[in-house]
């Protein structure tokens, strides 16, 4: 199965977020999943690296707009690069190409990825699939959002999100969701 991993480009190898992503990539590859990432550095690189080092297949979805903006190229662990012209096309590819998505801590881009996928699930624009958010920041952030804006989010729409704290818990939750 193809699993997209969303996450930040900022974490360095010595940081916890990078190590969590590395572990996540390893676990996913050992379970036989193809890992799809945004293809660049930080947790995208770490998940790609973990998967590649564990013998898995890694697809990196890069973007010409981002490459022009930051002069970036795909990380060394990407086995197959899918370069899209625009950020919108990249986001659509990351979401449309997977059967599940896992989100590590991140910034505006990661938040956009999570919200876009969540909304597509809500309006049934994509087939049902797990969306698992890793790390306490996601639960805190979205609980705060729901406390302030919850009247605009139906209870049935909240069921698309799953919250876990670790890479291991994410893999277990993914397995559980796939069996149901």
Residue ranges and their predicted role:
Residues 88-125, 132, 180:
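Active-site/ligand-binding-proximal alpha/beta "capping" segment
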Residues 93-96, 154-180:
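A charged, well-structured terminal subsegment
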Residues 73-77, 151-156:
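Short, conserved catalytic or adaptor-binding loops enriched in Gly and charged residues
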Residues 60-64, 104, 118-144, 155-158:
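Short, acidic/small-residue loops that bind anionic groups at enzyme active sites
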Residues 8-11, 64-66, 106-109:
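Short glycine-rich anion-binding loops that position phosphate/pyrophosphate groups of nucleotides
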Residues 42-103:
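Acidic/glycine-enriched connector segments
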Residues 1-59:
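Glycine-rich beta-alpha loop segments
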Residues 42-50, 139-150:
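Glycine-rich, charge-decorated loop segments at or immediately adjacent to ligand/cofactor-binding or catalytic sites
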């Amino acid at each position: 199965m193809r699993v997209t991993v969303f996450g930040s480009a900022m974490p360095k190898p010595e940081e916890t977020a990078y190590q969590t992503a590395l572990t996540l990539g390893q676990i996913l590859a050992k379970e036989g999943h193809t890992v799809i990432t945004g293809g660049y550095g930080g947790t995208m690189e770490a998940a790609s690296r973990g998967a590649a080092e564990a013998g898995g297949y890694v697809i990196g979805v890069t973007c010409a707009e981002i490459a022009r903006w930051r002069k970036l190229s795909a990380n060394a662990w990407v086995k197959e690069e899918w370069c899209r012209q625009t950020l919108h096309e990249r986001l659509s590819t990351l979401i449309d190409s997977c059967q599940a998505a896992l989100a590590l801590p991140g910034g505006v881009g990661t938040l956009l990825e999570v919200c876009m996928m969540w909304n597509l699930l809500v309006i049934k624009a994509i087939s049902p699939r797990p969306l698992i958010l890793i790390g306490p920041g996601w639960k805190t952030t979205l609980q705060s959002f729901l406390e302030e804006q919850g009247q605009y989010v139906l209870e049935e729409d909240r069921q698309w999100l799953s919250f876990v704290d670790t890479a291991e818990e994410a893999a277990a939750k993914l397995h559980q969701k796939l069996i149901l």
